[in-house]
């Protein structure tokens, strides 16, 4: 429920502010006045106000002392300090008790109106602007989707769609969210066809015009940090989506200057293939040829059991010398607490500290098996919200803070994302076909609707 458009202005010289009061009333606000703190408290106990303008110097007690009593009556009411004092100590006190704004007298009526409008109508104004911006941009995005896009243009489109998804998800514009979702369905179909026609060419001609792939992450993004700084923190957040990153980015940006780059996951984009490609710099068949004993008839979990060795080998080849690697995988609270104890020692040494965080992957896949997880992360917006809540008190954030304190550069990435599927794709297969939902290996595979799948006949070409 929006706060009322009423203002309580508390000032023992309120008669000198009549022009300000009149100006606010002309713009649709109702202003009530109080000359003393006790009068203000009595008024506040009778009715709620949209915002309180509070003089710092009141008869009997300071305005700052009155704030606690105001908040005990209405904890959510915005309070703006209006004072003659320009002392930094007063300003620091105001910031410390979390006042919503701070104005130094003399103030002109327009200043006061701006602050009040921001506090009482800011959300509504931002929602209206967001809606106008999206409607205007939506037509352009649709035209862009229908054009011949190269891999760079696909990156630009995907990033912008993820940004819109995050922004609209924070709003109450349900109709716009539905329009964006319908657009995303078309984008996913078009991108699948693009990958189907281009991916084999990228593998056949690795020196041609192709995007960075999973196998290029360490060479393009990690080794430059090592060459410049001698050490780096390398973080892989399993199954982190681009829209989730948009919500985490402000937190990371408060610690570091962020430089964003994008790469395409190899196929299949499942963890055993995509993440091993990052740590090894090799495609799956190349890993199998180099380490045949590691990949056999095993479950998916064991296929990622050698990431530390793969990263060590790759860095040796890229740098031309042995690079110390400290590797940890964090999937439980206990592992996160153990990492917190060890991370200062890790980051004090040269080389790479590599961390894999599994929470987002566990949350995403656990929705299908756990009713509670499904309830708290039932859609993309809820999944983003839970991911942000986890991050704000996570071992990952604590590791990033330690890296910032020690001035250790960070490479943070994901191995693959996820898609909330609403329409199932039926695949007919024999019993011995792989159970993974991202891909199927087997004989006589057939999709009920061919357009829902990418059919691969020559595995070596993919």
Predicted features along the sequence, with ranges:
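Short amphipathic alpha-helix used as the core "switch/output" element in two-component signaling
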Residues: 42, 64-75
């Amino acid at each position: 429920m929006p706060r009322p458009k009423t203002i309580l202005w508390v000032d023992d010289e309120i008669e000198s502010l009549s022009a300000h009061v009149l100006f606010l009333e002309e713009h649709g606000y109702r202003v009530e006045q109080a000359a003393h703190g006790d009068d203000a408290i009595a008024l506040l106990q009778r009715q709620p106000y949209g915002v309180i303008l509070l003089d710092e110097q009141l008869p009997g007690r300071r305005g700052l002392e009155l704030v606690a009593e105001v908040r005990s009556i209405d904890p959510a009411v915005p309070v703006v300090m209006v004072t003659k004092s320009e002392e930094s100590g007063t300003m620091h006190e105001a910031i410390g008790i979390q006042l919503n704004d701070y104005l130094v007298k003399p103030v002109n009526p327009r200043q006061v109106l701006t602050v009040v409008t921001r506090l009482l109508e800011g959300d509504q104004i931002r929602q209206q602007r967001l809606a106008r911006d999206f409607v205007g941009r939506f037509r352009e995005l649709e035209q862009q989707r229908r054009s011949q896009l190269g891999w760079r243009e696909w990156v630009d489109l995907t990033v912008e769609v993820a940004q819109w998804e995050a922004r609209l998800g924070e709003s109450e514009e349900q109709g716009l969210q539905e329009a964006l979702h319908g657009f995303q369905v078309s984008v996913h179909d078009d991108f699948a066809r693009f990958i189907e026609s281009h991916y084999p060419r990228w593998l056949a001609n690795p020196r041609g015009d192709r995007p960075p792939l999973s196998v290029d992450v360490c060479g393009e993004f990690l080794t430059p940090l090592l060459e410049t700084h001698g050490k780096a923190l390398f973080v892989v957040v399993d199954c982190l989506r681009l829209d989730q990153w948009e919500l985490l980015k402000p937190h990371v940006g408060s610690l570091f200057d962020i430089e964003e780059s994008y790469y395409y996951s190899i196929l299949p984009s499942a963890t055993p293939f995509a993440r091993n490609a990052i740590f090894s710099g090799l495609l799956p068949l190349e890993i199998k040829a180099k380490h045949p004993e590691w990949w056999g008839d095993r479950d998916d979990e064991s296929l990622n059991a050698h990431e530390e060795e793969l990263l060590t080998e790759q860095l040796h080849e890229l740098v031309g010398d042995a690079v110390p690697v400290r590797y940890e995988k964090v999937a439980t609270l206990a592992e996160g607490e153990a990492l917190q104890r060890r991370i200062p020692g890790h980051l004090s040494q040269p080389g790479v500290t590599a961390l894999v965080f599994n929470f987002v992957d566990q949350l995403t896949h656990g929705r299908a098996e756990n009713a509670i997880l499904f309830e708290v992360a039932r859609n993309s917006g809820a999944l983003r919200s839970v991911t942000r809540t986890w991050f704000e008190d996570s071992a990952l954030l604590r590791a990033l803070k330690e890296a910032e304190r020690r001035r250790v550069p960070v490479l943070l990435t994901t191995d693959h994302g996820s898609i909330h599927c609403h329409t199932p794709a039926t695949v007919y297969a024999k019993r011995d076909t792989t159970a993974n939902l991202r891909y199927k290996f087997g004989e006589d595979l057939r999709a009920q609707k061919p357009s829902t799948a990418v059919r691969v006949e020559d595995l070596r070409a993919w």
